[in-house]
Amino acid sequence: MNEEMKMTQEREGRILEAAIDTWGSEMQIVVAIEEMSELTKALTKYIRADDAATISVSIREEMADVGIMLNQLSLIFGDTTEEEIRKLNRLRR
């Protein structure tokens, strides 16, 4: 991993930890639920919509929000690497 990427990840970690410290774990869990709901809504619109290009932008924005919140949830509940490996191994079968 290059030095710039490592610095970016460290900075992101500090930002995420600051958000948890400022608003608390419980509130960040609520925000994660809200962001996942917004992604669900955007995906549903994509399936039903005629203007897929516009909805695709919204989906990418919501995916970014959910990704950030998943990173915060990892800080709150712990790393999911082992679970992800198990799930990927099951998919491979």
List the predicted regions and their residue ranges.
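Flexible "arm" and connector segments at domain edges
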Residues: 1-93
